[in-house]
């Protein structure tokens, strides 16, 4: 079921997968020596999910599928379970990254990041927001940021450190830009641009600002367990933003 779902949601069809392999033949070939090491990550993934159960005791734990995709998704989740694209975690000594474009070179991670991406998609599986139509930039960014923040609590890291490293020195200016656009549905410059990112600006800054909102909300909460449940059940994103107090962290009032 996981392969069928990943094919539908992320790969598209066999021709698109073949095209990705043809465009990066040495990179895909290098995955053969890494995929047997996936088994080495299973204990760490299980430990991470056990910590997630401690954080959210009433959570659901779906099946996890590890698949080779077409370099466009590290993971996704739906009712089938969690689908992880292992080709996005092929960074290792000797990996031929020269075949990859700038965005892929920035985002391709190591196998050690697999527990964090599993945790991130696990959070998406738990989220219960009901949104009619396309989410606003605010809604989408908080959804992704909550997933990164809770994943970090369980896995000890999140999957977007390179984005944080770029964004933090520019935090105040980015907040002003985000605030002006957060109620629209244009994600350009903030989310899901992948290889279409412009210049040195990372493609997924929305993950960073959503993480900052989630972290601020959690740190201000007296009841941390209740705060985690509120993050997962959130239906009022403007109220969540206001309660986080994050604007003051960015120098606002």
Q: What spans do the regions from the language model cover?
A:
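An alpha-helix initiation/capping motif
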Residues: 140-141, 168, 207
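N-terminal mature-domain "stem" immediately C-terminal to a signal peptide or N-terminal signal-anchor/transmembrane
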Residues: 1-25
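Beta-strand segments within the central parallel beta-sheet cores of soluble alpha/beta enzyme folds
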Residues: 65-66, 166, 228-231
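Long, contiguous secondary-structure blocks with strong helical propensity
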Residues: 45-46, 58, 153-166, 191-197, ...
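Acidic/His-rich structured neighborhood in mature extracellular/periplasmic domains
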Residues: 20-160
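Pan-zinc metallopeptidase signature
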Residues: 176-253
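Small-residue-rich helix-loop
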Residues: 145-146, 163-178
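Amphipathic alpha-helical surface "interface" segments used
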Residues: 73, 170-173, 235-238
């Amino acid at each position: 079921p996981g392969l069928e779902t990943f094919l539908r949601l992320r790969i598209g069809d066999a021709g698109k997968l073949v095209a990705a392999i043809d465009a990066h033949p040495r990179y895909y070939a290098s995955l053969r020596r890494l995929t047997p090491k996936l088994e080495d990550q299973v204990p760490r993934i299980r430990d991470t999910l056990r910590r997630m159960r401690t954080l959210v005791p009433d959570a659901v734990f779906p099946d996890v599928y590890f698949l080779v995709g077409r370099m466009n998704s590290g993971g996704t989740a739906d009712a089938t379970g969690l689908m992880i694209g292992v080709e996005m975690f092929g960074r290792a000594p000797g990996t031929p990254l020269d075949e990859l474009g700038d965005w892929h070179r920035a985002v391709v991670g190591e196998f050690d990041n697999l527990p964090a991406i599993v945790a991130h998609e696990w959070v998406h599986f738990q989220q219960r927001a009901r949104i009619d139509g396309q989410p606003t930039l605010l809604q989408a960014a908080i959804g992704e940021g909550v997933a990164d923040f809770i994943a970090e609590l369980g896995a000890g890291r999140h999957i977007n450190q390179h984005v944080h490293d770029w964004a933090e020195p520019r935090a105040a200016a980015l907040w002003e830009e985000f605030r002006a656009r957060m109620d629209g549905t244009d994600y350009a410059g903030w989310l899901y641009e992948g290889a279409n990112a412009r210049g040195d600006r990372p493609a997924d800054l929305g993950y960073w600002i959503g993480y900052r909102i989630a972290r601020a909300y959690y740190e201000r909460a007296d009841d941390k367990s209740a705060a985690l449940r509120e993050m997962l059940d959130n239906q009022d994103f403007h109220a969540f933003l206001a309660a986080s107090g994050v604007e003051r962290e960015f120098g606002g009032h």
